[in-house]
Amino acid sequence: MRARIAANESAAASQVRTLNTAEVSYVTGYPAQGYGTLAQLGGPAPCVPVVAGACLIDNSLATNYAGKGKSGYNFAIAIINQGQYVATATPIAVGSTGVNSFCSIEDGVVRKDPAGALNATEAACGALAALGN
């Protein structure tokens, strides 16, 4: 079980990094829009980049894997305003699908919460320790 949790956590942290990269690309490509939601970063196939679906991430991630999460984690992006976002990955079942939750804000640093809590505010995420990688 520990090996599965470790694999899930590694995948979740990697997805948060992917979301950071996509946010930088989105805000660069659509500066008047600001940062994008999960849906705005994705787009259904065949994907043609537009503000509502920029084709920067796989549409499976953009839909949080049809609302079911992936590898034991749920993914979300909260837009605070055009200049701030919080990307999160939280365990579906803390202690069995994952222990740590992960988040990142516009500084691009992935942080972890050993309690597995949802840290969907800029202040909550920013107060956590950076993931050591």
Locate predicted features.
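Extracellular/periplasmic head regions of type IV pilus-like filament subunits
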Residues: 18-100, 104-109, 114, 127-133
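Short, charged, solvent-exposed linker or helix-capping segments at domain edges/interfaces
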Residues: 122-124
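A short acidic/small-residue loop/turn micro-motif
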Residues: 116-120
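Amphipathic alpha-helical segments typified by the pilin-like N-terminal helix
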Residues: 1-25
